[in-house]
Design a protein with these regions (language model features):
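DNA major-groove recognition helix of helix-turn-helix/homeodomain DNA-binding modules
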Residues: 43-62
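Charged low-complexity stretches with an acidic bias
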Residues: 64-68
């Protein structure tokens, strides 16, 4: 997962790096580093985020918000 796709995934989920750090029990600096060149999101975290995004997309498709 690239820094760009990592940030895009968090944005689609409505999450921040700080919030993700709390959920994962990791330091804010560690999670923030994943947005920088030369760092990478660990494979297990990337897979978990992709599963969360898939679940979110299914949920939004199957139960969309009410129309205005």
């Amino acid at each position: 997962m690239t820094p760009t796709s990592y940030l895009a995934t968090l944005a689609r989920l409505g999450w921040t790096p700080a919030g993700l750090a709390r959920q994962l029990g990791r330091s804010g600096n560690t999670v923030a580093n994943w947005t920088r060149p030369g760092y990478r999101v660990p494979d297990d975290v990337a897979a978990w985020l992709e599963r969360r995004l898939d679940a979110h997309d299914r949920w939004m498709r199957d139960d969309p918000p009410p129309s205005p």
